[in-house]
């Protein structure tokens, strides 16, 4: 019985990092898909990755895209977009992204994403800072 308990504890401890890695991979896939939609000017696809709370603030895909173009130009159009450090806490994923905008200026984006009740991952926010600027 004790051996069974130890085996169960070991399996649980090994599953947590694997789940976190799966969550990060899913989050990166969502971010990548949204950025690709921005590059195609596909408002519907980009909007589909926004969490319900974001969709409440921006009730139509074209309104959402206008906000991104005006407030998140380095995310909307860039020379490079590379994933950095990620953290997982409960159902929230925080993903750092290193961006070089169309003019060659480096930026850091801090994305937050949440696991949804249906199992999908949606973007709940993005903070954009010039590289080296304190958070």
Each model region followed by its residue ranges:
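Bacterial N-terminal signal peptides
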Residues: 5-15
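Generic anion/oxyanion-binding catalytic loop in active/binding sites
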Residues: 9, 35, 53
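Short, histidine-centered active-site or binding-site loop motifs used for metal coordination
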Residues: 12, 50, 127
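Short, low-complexity N-terminal intrinsically disordered segments enriched in polar/charged residues
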Residues: 16-40
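Short solvent-exposed beta->alpha transition segments
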Residues: 25-29, 43-92
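Alpha-helix boundary/capping and short turn/kink residues
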Residues: 40-43, 104
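Exposed beta-sheet edge and beta->alpha loop/turn motif
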Residues: 85-135
């Amino acid at each position: 019985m004790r051996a069974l308990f130890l085996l169960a504890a070991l399996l649980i401890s090994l599953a947590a990092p694997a789940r976190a890695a799966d969550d990060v991979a899913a989050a990166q896939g969502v971010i990548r898909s949204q950025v690709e939609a921005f590059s195609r000017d596909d408002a519907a696809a980009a909007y589909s990755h926004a969490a319900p709370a974001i969709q409440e603030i921006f009730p139509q895909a074209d309104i959402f895209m206008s906000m991104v173009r005006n407030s998140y130009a380095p995310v909307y159009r860039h020379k490079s977009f590379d994933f950095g450090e990620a953290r997982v806490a409960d159902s929230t994923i925080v993903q750092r992204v290193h961006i070089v905008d169309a003019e060659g200026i480096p930026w850091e984006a801090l994305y937050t994403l949440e696991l949804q009740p249906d199992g999908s991952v949606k973007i709940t926010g993005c903070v954009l800072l010039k590289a080296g600027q304190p958070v």
